Regions:
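N-terminal compositionally biased, intrinsically disordered segments and leader/signal-like regions
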Residues: 6, 71, 109, 159, ...
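Bacterial N-terminal signal peptides
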Residues: 9-19
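N-terminal small/polar-rich segments of proteins
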Residues: 24-136, 171-221
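Local beta-strand/beta-hairpin segments that build beta-sheet-rich folds
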Residues: 75, 146-148, 152-181
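Low-complexity, serine/threonine/proline-enriched polar segments
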Residues: 117-161
Length: 221
């Protein structure tokens, strides 16, 4: 049997909701948290800035995800930096990525989790109250793969868990910094994507994930 071919492309971008003008980036901010990485791919790639002062715009191409990719899983890690001078929340919204053919790759076939939340440096604000990654996203989907009764790989959380604007993270103030982005004035966390190569109906599809940071629930420092 000839293996089929299926590609999946994800665009990760941001929207900032923090006011207007220069203050817009000061109060609530998302940027690159470092260089994104991809492992286990055949013909895949991930592009994005490694500079934490640059905007977060990442394109993920999982490449070949049929059984002709003999790696156990394709994993992508995207570091994301966030800054705020107030309590905040981060929401994710996924658009696209669905197929009419149930045998084609679907949003539920792409694991999505968030973890590795840590301070950037000396100007990161340390608070008593915790920063919370919300269920079901607090996991590394590449290490939590199961095969269901139909033989399809499943994950604790997937792209399908964010097809409406969904809060993934919230907490108290993040930064002690000044009026502009710095390399040490916030926190970084990882967005982790996972896709298990298997038989899918032929084709290529794409999805876009938009991350939005805005004022969050009351969470004193």
């Amino acid at each position: 049997m000839k293996p089929n071919t299926f590609g999946f492309i994800i665009l990760l971008c941001i929207i900032l909701l923090a006011g207007f003008g220069n203050a817009f980036a000061q109060a609530l901010d998302i940027s690159s948290g470092g260089a994104p990485t991809i492992t286990g791919s055949v013909g895949g790639s991930v592009t994005g800035s490694s500079n934490v002062l640059n905007d977060l715009v990442v394109t993920i191409n999982f490449g070949e995800v049929s059984p002709s990719n003999t790696n156990g899983i394709v994993k992508v890690v995207v570091p994301i930096a966030i800054r705020s001078n107030q309590q905040y929340k981060v929401q994710a919204l996924v658009t696209g990525g669905s197929n009419v053919n149930a045998q084609a790759l679907q949003r539920t076939d792409v694991g999505l989790g968030f973890n590795n939340f840590h301070a950037m440096g000396a100007k990161s604000r340390v608070c008593v109250n915790p920063h919370i990654i919300y269920a079901p996203f607090s996991n590394d989907p590449s290490g939590n793969v199961t095969i269901n009764a139909s033989g399809r790989a499943t994950y604790p959380s997937t792209l399908n868990n964010a097809i409406v604007a969904t809060t993934i993270l919230s907490g108290p103030r993040l930064s002690n910094g000044g009026s502009s982005r710095a390399t040490n004035d916030g926190y970084i966390f990882d967005a982790i994507f996972a896709l298990t190569p298997q038989f899918f109906a032929n084709g290529t599809t794409s999805a876009t994930i938009t991350l939005t940071i805005s004022a969050g629930p009351t969470s004193s420092c």
